[in-house]
């Protein structure tokens, strides 16, 4: 049972008892920093906040068929934690689990606050601390203050340092242009960032707009699911074969 005194003693709950560090984002960047903080400053009080309902960042948000890394995992992964699989590229689910294990080793799971959106952080010059507003019960896609929206609460956190590892785009909603005449389209328009878990592709005609990294991984996966796929692109991409097994990394692991 927690009391009001317990809450006051909680690190970050007051200017008199601030955190040493608040990390925003529980993806690769945030967990990488958590590891180094845990190694270099074991006595620090720190927390990790993420607006999503699980860690992983990009690898939690994106769940479309075929999602994988674009770079080899020997260079994309953590330098302190070798990629445990033999594959050159990492699948989305494997990368997310890889991040989770790194977070566990760093002690970040015990300091992780999910569904906690950092609404703002302001430097208090008099106190030499950051005053951070963390909103729970809502996400970055919602508007209004906690008092204006039912179920949302605010927690003020005080910290000596703030590190933003949240990336540069919104995880709540991807870029979605409106196409002329789309109101007359009888089919379904889907953004890979909000891929439905129950989507049936077998026997469907699918048009993939664009030929970037997402399209290159999505198209063959849709073909394997039985869809008839057409790629609509402005400029053709250069595509070449890539070994599925990383023989160099496997050699160094011996």
Indicate where each model-derived feature is located.
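Conserved N-terminal glycine/acidic-rich loop preference
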Residues: 2-32, 51-83, 102
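A generic local structural motif
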Residues: 7-10, 135-137, 149-151, 175-177, ...
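Rossmann-like dinucleotide-binding core of oxidoreductases
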Residues: 13-18, 22-23, 28, 32-33, ...
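FAD-dinucleotide binding site
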Residues: 18, 40-47, 54-56, 61-62, ...
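General small-molecule cofactor/ligand-binding pocket signal
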Residues: 47, 111-115, 190-191
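Glycine-rich active-site loop/strand segments that organize a redox cofactor
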Residues: 54-98, 236-254
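Feature captures the FAD/FMN-dependent oxidoreductase FAD-binding
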Residues: 86-169
């Amino acid at each position: 049972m927690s009391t009001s005194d317990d809450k006051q003693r909680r690190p970050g709950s007051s200017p008199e008892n601030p955190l040493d560090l608040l990390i925003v984002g529980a993806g690769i960047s945030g967990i990488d920093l958590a590891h180094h903080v845990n190694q270099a400053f074991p006595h620090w009080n720190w927390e990790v906040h993420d607006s999503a309902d699980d860690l992983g960042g990009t690898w939690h948000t994106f769940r479309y068929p075929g999602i994988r890394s674009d770079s080899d995992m020997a260079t994309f992964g953590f330098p302190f934690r070798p990629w445990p699989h033999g594959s050159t590229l990492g699948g989305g689910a494997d990368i997310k689990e890889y991040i989770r294990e790194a977070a566990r080793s760093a002690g970040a799971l015990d300091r992780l606050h999910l569904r906690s959106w950092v609404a703002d952080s302001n430097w208090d010059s008099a106190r030499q601390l950051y005053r951070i507003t963390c909103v729970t019960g809502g996400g970055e896609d919602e508007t209004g203050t906690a008092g204006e929206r039912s179920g949302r609460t605010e927690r003020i956190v005080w910290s000596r340092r703030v590190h933003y590892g949240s990336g540069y785009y919104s995880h709540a909603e991807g870029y979605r242009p409106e196409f002329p005449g789309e109101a007359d389209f009888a089919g379904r328009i889907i953004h890979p960032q909000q891929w439905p878990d129950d989507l049936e592709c077998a026997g469907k005609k699918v048009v993939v707009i664009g030929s970037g990294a997402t399209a290159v991984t999505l198209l063959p996966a849709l073909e394997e699911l039985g869809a008839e796929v057409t790629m609509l692109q402005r400029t053709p991409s250069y595509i070449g074969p890539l070994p599925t097994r990383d023989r160099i990394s496997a050699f160094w692991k011996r």
